[in-house]
Curated annotation (Swiss-Prot):
NCBIfam families on file: D_ala_D_alaTIGR, PRK01966.1-4, PRK14570.1
BP terms from Gene Ontology: cell wall organization; peptidoglycan biosynthetic process; regulation of cell shape
UniProt cross-references to InterPro entries, sorted A to Z: ATP-grasp, ATP_grasp_subdomain_1, D-Ala_lig_Van_CS, D_ala_D_ala, Dala_Dala_lig_C, Dala_Dala_lig_N, PreATP-grasp_dom_sf
Protein's recorded name: D-alanine--D-alanine ligase
Family note: Belongs to the D-alanine--D-alanine ligase family.
Disulphide linkage map: none
Organism: Borrelia garinii subsp. bavariensis (strain ATCC BAA-2496 / DSM 23469 / PBi)
Pathway field: Cell wall biogenesis; peptidoglycan biosynthesis
UniProt xrefs under Pfam families: Dala_Dala_lig_C (PF07478), Dala_Dala_lig_N (PF01820)
Binding residues for ATP: 167-222
Amino acid sequence: MKKNLMLIFGGVSFEHEISCKSAYSIYLALLDLNKYNIYPVYIDKCTGIWYLLDSVSDPPKLIDIDVLPIVSLLPGIGIFSNNKNLDIDVVFPVVHGRTGEDGAIQGVLKVMDIPCIGAGIIGSAISSNKYFCKLLLKSFNIPLVPFIGFRQYDYFLDKEEVKRNVREALGYPVIVKPAVLGSSIGINVAYSENQIEFFIEEALKYDLTILIEKFIEAREIECSIIGNEKIKIFSPGEVIVQDFIFYDYDAKYSVIPGNSIIFNIPAQLETNQLLSIKEYAFLVYKNLELRGMARVDFFVEKKSGKIYLNEINTIPGFTDISMFAKMCSHDGLQFKDLVDNLINYAFQSYINRKKRINFED
C-alpha cells in the first residue's frame, strides 16, 4: 500500500522561486518511484497560506489561489483539505530559507506528530543562523574564517564602535552577510571603511543579525552528506566562479553552468585536504545532530591551502543545477534513489524518537 507523502514548497521567503524549482525535481522523482501518493502543498509567498495542488510544474504555472483548497493543520487530529483528513504519513519540506530551514516548519510537524524529512528543530535552527552556528562550531575546533557579529540595535546604538571592531578584528576586505538567509542573498564585499556602512544597512534589510567575515581568496568546496546515525559522505565538488567575486545569487541562478560557472566533481584536492574536509563535515553533522541530509560548504584558501568551514545547508537545493544531488550521483546514488533514501531516513528517525519514554510510561 502506498504511503501518503506531502511535498511542501514555496514559502514566505526570498528563496521562494528556488524552492518551487527544487520541488519540481523532487516531484518528478516521486512520480518515477511510483511508491507514494503525492500531495503537493504550495505556501503562498505573500500570505503564507497553504494550498493543495494537483501537481507541480516548472516553470510554476500562474497559481490561482482563489480556486485552490486551503490546507489546515489540526494538532492531534490531522492535516485537512476540503474537510477531508489527508492521512499524511511523511512530509518532504522543500521550503528554503525563513520558516522552512530554520526549524519553524520542523516544529510544526513535530507538534503534528508526522515524520519530516531532514534535520529536526535544533539542527535546523542552529544551522540557519550563520553567526550563532559559527559561535558554536568554534567550541568543536572547526576552522573558521575570522568573523564578528552583531544585532541591529547594537549597530545603530554605536556605528563607530562596530566599524572600529571590523577594522581591528578583521581588516579589509570583508564580506557582509545577513545571518539568516540562504542563496547568498544580501551578501556584499566591502573593500574599505567607506563601503562598510552601506553594506551593513543593506544586509539589515534582510535580517536583524549581521555576520561579517574576513574576505579571503578561496576555492569553494561543497560536500553532500546523508543518513541519521550511520552517515555517508560523498566526494566533495568544487564550484569555480570565473566572472564573479564569489558564488553569489546571480552566479547561482542567473548564469548558465559552463559559461561563467564550472562544477568539478570530484574536486581536485590533496589527500590531506580531502580527509580534513570529510572529517570536519562528519563532526559538524554529528555535533549539530543533523539528520537525513545536509550540504556542508568549505573554503580552501588559494594561497595557503588552509581549509575553513563556510556554512551548512539542511535543505539544500534540488534544482537541475544544484550540487547536492550531483555529488551523490557522481558516487552512484541516482536522484530518485536519493529521494527514496531520504524518505526512509525520516521514518527511521521518527521511529527512534517514538521509542523514548513519555509521560504515559
